[in-house]
A protein has these predicted regions:
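Charged DNA-binding/catalytic regions of mobile-element recombinases
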Residues: 1-199
Length: 199
């Protein structure tokens, strides 16, 4: 993917404790993405960290990464996966907006620089108020309900397999009322059919 010549202005919500922000409402795919990190315990290993990038319009998880340390590399791996899945040709008709919290990893100089290189506009939630990233937070809760809370993982391999299987199921088969009962992949297919018919 060619990245030369791409630039973007970095935008953030002001970090004020009393400030509230409503969640942006996307009107098409690749307009608003959300990213976030969670962790869960693996016996004999410790905490395992998960970072995801999700398209708010299609509800598709575009990228995810697992690691033993909550480093910026983990966030970048999920981000690069998302770009490769959503924009395999390396081009977009307009910029993507990426919503995150104010954590040290997504606000690091390294992460911000990569976003600028990819022409992705970074927006952060207001201080101590994750409402702006509500769709991403909602997915993380679904992940915990479906994968983390019902299970006790005994190894990294077991945890990784469960995560991989869930994301495959979620994207291909998990129905959403906001998508007219379709899964993210099926909804994307319907969008493609509509665009083809209109061409």
């Amino acid at each position: 993917m060619r990245l030369d010549g791409l630039s973007v202005s970095v935008k953030r919500y002001k970090a004020k404790r009393a400030e509230t922000r409503s969640k942006p409402q996307p009107t098409h795919r690749n307009e608003w993405w959300g990213t976030d990190m969670t962790k869960f315990y693996v016996h004999g290993l410790g905490w395992l960290y998960l970072v995801i990038v999700i398209d708010w319009y299609t509800k598709r998880v575009l990228g995810y990464s697992l690691g033993l340390r909550p480093k910026t590399d983990l966030w970048l791996e999920a981000l690069h996966q998302a770009v490769e899945v959503a924009c395999p040709a390396g081009s977009r008709s307009e910029d993507v907006h990426l919503m995150s919290d104010n954590g040290s990893q997504p606000t690091s100089t390294r992460y911000e620089t990569i976003l600028e290189t990819l022409s992705i506009e970074h927006v952060t939630t207001s201080y101590n108020n994750p409402k702006g990233n509500a769709d991403t937070e909602r997915f993380m809760r679904t992940f915990k309900e479906e994968v983390v809370w019902p299970n006790e993982f005994e190894s990294l391999e077991e945890a990784t397999r469960a995560v991989d299987e869930f994301f495959l199921f979620y994207n291909q088969d998990y129905p959403h009322s906001t998508l007219m009962g379709m899964s993210p992949i099926d909804f994307e297919a319907s969008l493609n059919q509509t665009q083809t018919a209109a061409a």
